[in-house]
Amino acid sequence: MTLKNRYKESIRPKLLKDLGLKNIHQVPKVVKVNVNRGLGEAASNSKALEASLNEMATITGQKALVTRAKKAIAGFKIREGMPIGCTVTLRGDRMYSFLERFINLALPRIRDFRGVNPKSFDGRGNYTVGVKEQLIFPEISFDKIDSIRGMDITIVTSARSDQEGKALLQELGMPFSKN
């Protein structure tokens, strides 16, 4: 059973009851997943940007968008319009497919993994987790990467509070640490 079907058939009715909501449309759902990677060396090294775009496309199954500097910062040696990273926004079936792979395959492959930080909510039910290396994804092979780079994964939900967001992610299978 896919994560999307599990959400519709078992998670949504359970959350409706647990959160004491009156309408099925009030139940929090995952709206989108943002996968973002900042590349400091992209301004001077175009191969790093190209490799990063390919990795992001392999991991997410969707072409990555190049993010560019909004204004020049002399201290970082960047000018306006220079590429400084890449991002992918996932919605719909691709989002659920990515979340399922991230929660069930990628997170357990992190070294010394004891669960994700339950305090990484933003106050509006959205959750962000930082990944230190792309090797946790089974699609990436160690031989094909040139350097280890991390990424930020933001799960945007329709939850109105952090408690609702946490309840949703726990039901989806997100392994929160017990601290």
UniProtKB/Swiss-Prot annotation:
The GO biological-process annotations, alphabetized, read as: translation
Q: Which InterPro entries match?
A: Ribosomal_uL5, Ribosomal_uL5_bac-type, Ribosomal_uL5_C, Ribosomal_uL5_CS, Ribosomal_uL5_dom_sf, Ribosomal_uL5_N
For the keyword Acetylation, the answer is no
User: Transmembrane residues, as ranges?
Assistant: none
Q: Superkingdom, according to UniProt?
A: Bacteria
Print the keywords alphabetically.
Ribonucleoprotein, Ribosomal protein, RNA-binding, rRNA-binding, tRNA-binding
Which GO MF terms does the UniProt record name? rRNA binding; structural constituent of ribosome; tRNA binding
Q: Which Pfam families match?
A: Ribosomal_L5 (PF00281), Ribosomal_L5_C (PF00673)
Per the record, its GO cellular-component terms are:
ribonucleoprotein complex; ribosome
Q: How does it assemble?
A: Part of the 50S ribosomal subunit; part of the 5S rRNA/L5/L18/L25 subcomplex. Contacts the 5S rRNA and the P site tRNA. Forms a bridge to the 30S subunit in the 70S ribosome.
Q: Which HAMAP family match?
A: Ribosomal_uL5_B (MF_01333_B)
Which family is it part of?
Belongs to the universal ribosomal protein uL5 family.
Which function does this protein serve? This is one of the proteins that bind and probably mediate the attachment of the 5S RNA into the large ribosomal subunit, where it forms part of the central protuberance. In the 70S ribosome it contacts protein S13 of the 30S subunit (bridge B1b), connecting the 2 subunits; this bridge is implicated in subunit movement. Contacts the P site tRNA; the 5S rRNA and some of its associated proteins might help stabilize positioning of ribosome-bound tRNAs.
The entry's protein name is Large ribosomal subunit protein uL5
The species this protein was found in: Prochlorococcus marinus (strain MIT 9301)
